Regions:
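Amphipathic beta-strand/beta-sheet edge segments enriched in Tyr/Trp
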Residues: 46-57
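Negatively charged, low-complexity tracts enriched in Asp/Glu with abundant Ser/Thr
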Residues: 1-47, 61-94
Length: 94
């Protein structure tokens, strides 16, 4: 169960981070084969994780990155996780 003190972080994850990840997923689906982004949201705790993978022509994963957005983290830690994932994806979308 989510503690009262963490509800603001859960809302930040859902209202700020999640839409950014959904936009990345839409962009990847339209223009970049060989890169995938999977997002998982835990409805009970409000935590979220994202897994990005890069595949070669044989569908072998050649690089990957996982970002975890925990409701117990502060906004700076949540933003750091998002930025880590965004930087990883930038290498393959630039």
């Amino acid at each position: 169960m989510i503690d009262e003190e963490y509800k603001e972080n859960v809302e930040y994850i859902r209202s700020t981070i999640m839409p950014k990840l959904q936009k990345i997923q839409r962009d990847l689906a339209e223009s970049l084969p060989g890169v995938s982004l999977t997002v998982r949201l835990d409805g009970e705790t409000g935590s979220m994780s994202a897994y990005a993978a890069v595949f070669d022509d044989t569908c072998k994963v050649t690089d990957c990155c996982t970002a975890n957005f925990f409701y117990v983290d502060n906004k700076e830690e949540i933003d750091d996780e998002y930025n880590k994932l965004a930087e990883f994806l930038k290498k393959y979308t630039a």
